[in-house]
């Protein structure tokens, strides 16, 4: 982690400035209607309990990226997250970004599997990928977006259907994308302050 903060990331940041590239941080998360967080109340000595939502558990995945200029990109994934879906996301990100993208992600196996490496080699003029140190999610600003989304879902009326969960997720993510100042607050956490002024 120290090497990342003292050497690796400063080198990435310097390259981004020299090449007029944007640095984005990406991550995947599972979105579920059974994720219970927040506060509750019960009499002293009694463990608080919450009711689970009616019906079957609903779940899907989302991949997203943020940068310290307040930009946010996201994609809902119905089914298993794999190389093909990662490539679709990176293609969309590279297409929409006005400059070359330096994408920082964790070391999930799919992030550097053969199909992804081959695609990146063909598109290296538009996008490059860099990897965070292993077991260091706290260094990724996109983790704050994930926490923001899950807080929004778990503090609202429970979503009992897949469609309801998808609707709430989409509404929240559209709001985040349209709120650059909100995205910038993700970079105020002490663990990711290193990334706040790097481009």
For the regions a protein language model found, what residue spans apply to each?
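Short functional hotspots at interaction and active-site rims
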Residues: 1-199
């Amino acid at each position: 982690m120290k090497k990342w903060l003292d050497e690796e990331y400063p080198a990435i940041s310097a390259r981004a400035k020299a090449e007029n590239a944007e640095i984005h941080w990406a991550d995947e998360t599972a979105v579920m209607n059974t994720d219970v967080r927040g506060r509750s109340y019960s009499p002293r000595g009694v463990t608080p309990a919450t009711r689970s939502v009616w019906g079957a558990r609903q779940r899907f995945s989302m991949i997203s990226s943020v940068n310290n200029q307040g930009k946010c990109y996201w994609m809902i994934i119905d089914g298993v997250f794999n190389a093909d879906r990662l490539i679709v996301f990176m293609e969309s990100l590279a297409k929409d970004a006005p400059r070359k993208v330096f994408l920082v992600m964790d070391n999930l196996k799919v992030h550097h599997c053969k199909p992804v490496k081959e695609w990146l080699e063909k598109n290296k003029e538009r996008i490059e990928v860099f990897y965070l140190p292993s077991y260091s999610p706290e260094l990724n600003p996109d983790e704050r977006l994930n926490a923001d989304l899950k807080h929004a879902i778990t503090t609202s009326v429970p979503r009992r259907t897949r469609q309801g969960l998808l609707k709430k997720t989409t509404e929240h993510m559209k709001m985040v994308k349209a709120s650059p100042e909100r995205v910038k607050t993700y970079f105020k956490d002490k663990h990711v302050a290193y990334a706040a002024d790097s481009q």
